[in-house]
Amino acid sequence: MNDELREAMGSAAVAAAKAVDYEGAGTVEFLLAEDGSFHFLEMNTRLQVEHPISECISGLDLVEQQIRVAAGLPLSFSQEDLTIRGHAIEARIYAEDPANGFLPATGPLAMFRPPEGPGIRLDTGVREGDEASIDFDPMLAKLVVHAADRPAAIRRMRRALQDFVLLGATTNIGFLVDVLSKDSFSAGETTTDFIEVNFPDGWHPGCLHSDEGEGMAMHAALAAGGAEHLGLHRRVSASATVDGEGGRGSPYNPFLSLRRNFP
């Protein structure tokens, strides 16, 4: 995304809203072709799930602005007032199983310890002790990072994901770490077939890179200790009978690799 493309997309989005006399918060989506042309996809008459990215790089509270407009008040800024600072990335944390076709997963959020630190933001409606169930959307949280540029934001997001301890329900955190580790992602080659191209055989926990090993081992130990404290280790026999990457012998399964700690 360069300044010229951003200006062109912004103008097209405004024109689309004006064409239907729309007033309020809205998000216009485009598909970007390799030749730099872009094509209208849809317009959502609301703030997009990824609106924290815009808030981070602009310093604006878009939810506040949405409420102001709905109340008949003017925006508190003009287009000329807007400046972009740094780069932001958002990762959706889902209760889902990337190794099983990204099917939704259920289970207790027995341990929910999000990362903290400069440039890290978490938007969530869950807390430790809640349950990921079939009654609600499987998205648990939105993890957002802000840094000076894209490479720094990628590094910050990887570290934040590695520091995210979530025990009880299967999540996509490991998959997200692997996505961020791909050279193609760093290069901005995030096409609509990114997963098929970069994970042609599907994703599994064994895809984790070696430089994550130490951090994953630390979290495995923490998870095992937390499981023992919460009594979850006594349930493992019912869920650890399947062979494969996520089953017996997996180096990323805290129950099995550290089972010597359990009675």
Locate the predicted segments by residue.
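A long amphipathic alpha-helix within ATP-dependent nucleotide-binding catalytic cores
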Residues: 1-32, 160
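Alpha-helix N-cap/helix-initiation motif
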Residues: 2-5, 51-55
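Catalytic cores of soluble metabolic enzymes centered on carboxylation/carboxyl-transfer
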Residues: 13, 31, 52-263
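Conserved metal-phosphate-binding beta-hairpin within the catalytic cores
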Residues: 21-49
